[in-house]
Amino acid sequence: MLTIKANLRIYHKKGATRRLRKQNKCPAVIYNRGQEPSIPIILNQNDILHPEAVIQLYKNNVILLFIENQQPITVKVQELQYHPFKSKLIHIDFTRV
């Protein structure tokens, strides 16, 4: 099982996410089941683009996210959005398992 460290994302607007991407970070969202609100998070590009991590992301395996000051969350990848010509992720959507 792949484990990734994440931080909560406070700012959700376009300018804030662009600044994150320039800092080699990747914005992501964890969608919950039912009426619970989604959780916006920030991931480090180096953790995600590691060869073992890429394989796990594409296999749609269960991933364990460690978010600061919270219990670990088990998720699956719902969608990966890549930059058109750079080898960087733009955004990831996770679904809570």
Swiss-Prot record:
Asked if the record carries the keyword Protease, the reply is: no
Q: Which InterPro entries match?
A: Rbsml_bL25/Gln-tRNA_synth_N (IPR020056), Ribosomal_bL25/Gln-tRNA_synth (IPR011035), Ribosomal_bL25_short (IPR020055), Ribosomal_L25_dom (IPR029751)
The GO terms describing molecular function are: 5S rRNA binding; structural constituent of ribosome
Q: Name one Pfam family in it.
A: Ribosomal_L25p
**GO terms for biological process?**
translation
What are the protein's UniProt keywords?
Answer: Ribonucleoprotein, Ribosomal protein, RNA-binding, rRNA-binding
Superkingdom, natural source: Bacteria
Keyword Chloroplast in the entry? The reply is no
Task: Give the GO cellular component terms, alphabetically.
Answer: ribonucleoprotein complex; ribosome
The entry's family comment says: Belongs to the bacterial ribosomal protein bL25 family.
Quote the function comment for this protein: This is one of the proteins that binds to the 5S RNA in the ribosome where it forms part of the central protuberance.
- What subunit structure does UniProt give? Part of the 50S ribosomal subunit; part of the 5S rRNA/L5/L18/L25 subcomplex. Contacts the 5S rRNA. Binds to the 5S rRNA independently of L5 and L18.
Question: What name goes with this protein?
Answer: Large ribosomal subunit protein bL25
Gene name of the encoded protein: rplY
